[in-house]
Curated annotation (Swiss-Prot):
Keywords: Cytoplasm, Host-virus interaction, Initiation factor, Protein biosynthesis, RNA-binding, tRNA-binding
A GO CC term assigned to this protein in UniProt: cytosol
Alphabetized Pfam families for the sequence: eIF-1a
Compartment(s): Cytoplasm
Biased composition (Basic residues): 1-15
GO biological process, one term: ribosome assembly
HAMAP family according to UniProt: aIF_1A
Family, per entry: Belongs to the eIF-1A family.
Name by which UniProt lists this protein: Eukaryotic translation initiation factor 1A, X-chromosomal
PANTHER family to which the protein is assigned, alphabetical: EIF-1A
Membrane-crossing residue ranges in chain numbering: none
Region feature Disordered, mapped onto this chain: 1-26, 114-144
Length: 144
């Protein structure tokens, strides 16, 4: 058999779709849409979300978002309400932490909404790491 001398298959040539770096325009809700927070991931492209109008709904992740946008619990999402089923909705968009904070600042989200803070560092976080000194004696490593 010939030796593998390539750098990978056809997926390498296609490359990754890196669209996280560009900032997108903030999308507000329209009529027939509602903001919601994910309570539980159910699998099979479905999730349980608490809409900010006070109704708990079973949401279906649409095909455009299904494998490209990963949705976790406590994420803020925009859902499209169904006219014929009040307890079901379709996920239209997932907001990242910065967009959710700006929605809260605009007054679109209620004050009690908890935004997941794991995506970005807050203003108080530093890049420095504080180490506790184990020994108080001033021994140099070269002297040992």
């Amino acid at each position: 058999m010939p030796k593998n001398k390539g750098k990978g298959g056809k997926n390498r040539r296609r490359g990754k779709n890196e669209n996280e770096s560009e900032k997108r325009e903030l999308v507000f809700k329209e009529d027939g849409q509602e903001y919601a927070q994910v309570i539980k991931m159910l699998g099979n492209g479905r999730l349980e979300a608490m809409c900010f109008d006070g109704v708990k709904r079973l949401c279906h992740i649409r095909g455009k978002l299904r494998k490209k946008v990963w949705i976790n619990t406590s994420d803020i999402i925009l859902v499209g309400l169904r006219d014929y089923q009040d307890n079901k909705a379709d996920v239209i968009l997932k907001y990242n932490a910065d967009e959710a904070r700006s929605l809260k600042a605009y007054g679109e989200l209620p004050e009690h909404a908890k935004i997941n803070e794991t995506d970005t560092f807050g203003p108080g976080d530093d890049d420095e790491i504080q180490f506790d000194d184990i020994g108080d004696d001033d021994e140099d490593i070269d002297d040992i």
